[in-house]
Amino acid sequence: DKVSTSIDFIFPIAADDLERIFNTPLENPNFIASWTTTPWTLPGNLALTINDEFIYDLIEIEFDKKKMNIVLAKDLIESTLERIGISEYKTLGSCEGHKFLGLKAKHPYLDRSSLIIAGDHVTTEAGTGIVHTAPGHGLEDYAVSKENGLEVLSPVKANGTFNDDVDHFAGLFVFKANENIVELLKENGVLLSESSYEHSYPHCWRHRTPVMFRATPQWFISMSSKDLLEKSINSVDGIRWEPAWGEARMQSMLETRPDWCISRQRSWGVPIALLVHNETGEIHPHTQQIIEQVATLVEKKGIQAWHDVEISDLIDDAEDYEKITDCLDVWFDSGVTHACVLDVNEDLQFPADLYLEGSDQHRGWFQSSLLTSIAMKDVSPYKTVLTHGFVVDSEGKKMSK
């Protein structure tokens, strides 16, 4: 669990838009209210996400001795006003959530707008029913923003500080910027409440510290290109599964899997030997030959060869390109053993008679082996897959580690 700064804050919105969808004349300043436990993500806000099946009310309140109109999900009015410390309000109108779609509110402190979009992840469990959405700071935010054609704005560097072009907070470590952001909202008159909130939050398994969600460019294998996923799913039926339930397990995991992110940012591992253009980000047109060159070097000198080789040793237009420093996903490494073990040993045969591992490998080795083999050879790398259990100690903990 983590104790976070939770805030209710508001986005100004044009009276004309609200008068039209609520069908009522308005006199006070108008706002849409949102709630978050991550104020540091506000520099990345580009949207407000509603649930298009909810009912939203426009209510009049008096806050800080001023009257204002705010939009809230009908089912969350009471809990929101309790956080703000207000007991009295007047309902000015109600409307379905879908009527807000496409409208724009003004960012709480930046000179830009926030598009109102819809997402199924918006619930009435907490908050206001309107989710502040930063495409670069969370999987749900990223997905719903991509669906609506929004830029993936990720204004945070790899060291956890804001980019140099972030107004007000450039260079600040993001978690330490919470106080500054809350103070700025207060100065702009758009902060309604602030409190401590204890909740479950992802932590690094190794360091036990809270993680920071940050969208970064990565390399993917497309599941739809050349029907890779469809072919992989169709191949499952021709494999023998022991126990038999392994077939349904693999089938269901494949049916819901996204594109495969194969890049990792680590100091160890098999490098992704790509050169990309400094301006366009496109890979070099002679990538196949470059990879062959690098592979030959690695066979002679080891993995370090990629880091040591100069770009000018590989291509003539070296000044236009830069090396990728990412490493391959380890599941890609292990997943191609059918090629780098079976194919190069005359005493072995392809496909393998048997792959065997624990049940967690339907998502790991079994799956990565199947996908890479279908991509490379159009056939499964194994005839039979055996899933075994785990030996555990007296407390039920597995002993494999």
Which residue ranges define each predicted feature?
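Residue patterns forming the tRNA-binding/recognition surfaces of aminoacyl-tRNA synthetases
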Residues: 1-43, 63, 99-106, 112, ...
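Protease-associated
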Residues: 47, 54-130, 139-143
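Active-site-adjacent "gating/activation" loops or surface patches in catalytic cores
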Residues: 109-117, 323-352, 383
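Alpha-helical support elements that line or immediately flank enzyme active sites
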Residues: 139-144, 368-377
